[in-house]
Amino acid sequence: MIFYLHGFDATSPGNHEKMRQLQFIDPDVRLVSYSTLHPKHDMQHLLKEVAKQMKHSDDPSPLMVGVGLGAYWAERIGFLNGLKSVLINPNLHPEENMQGKIDRPEEYADIANKCVSQFREKNTHKAMCIFSVNDEMFDNQQLASELSAYYSIDWDDVQPHKFPQLAAHLPKIKAFKLA
């Protein structure tokens, strides 16, 4: 089972395409949607929804995959549920870069402060990151340096921020899920 968490653009047709591509790894791909506008509510909703979905699966190695803001949540929700995560062009600092896009971006800082202290140290090797060299949204070199002590980092020379084509990375994602 793969949980797919969309980015800030929840209605992008690319989300369906990424889910279809992920079905080459596991036919059971589930979209876990969230508002993107209310971080505290989103966190509670995602925790409940993932726990509910996991009760109805016998997959020994479920995986969370998120793009952009979805990767922010995939890392945290995955950690809190003991799941591996794939973070694609993760938005690591929505409290800074979501100003003007959502009502209360400061809630992300509050979530970070309330999360398990040093959770990345406790989550080491339980996530893999895929970064676009040509990400038009974020400085991925900086973000990769924040995560490289904890997670493996893969680079893509072709894909933009929304990462419409996962094909080149599907074998690594599958190996990570099954390892």
Swiss-Prot record:
Gene3D superfamilies from the UniProt entry = alpha/beta hydrolase (3.40.50.1820)
**InterPro entries found in the cross-reference section:** AB_hydrolase_fold, UPF0227, UPF0227/Esterase_YqiA
What domain of life is recorded for the organism?
Answer: Bacteria
| NCBIfam families linked | PRK04940.1
Annotated family: Belongs to the UPF0227 family.
Protein name per the record: UPF0227 protein Sbal223_1944
UniProt source species: Shewanella baltica (strain OS223)
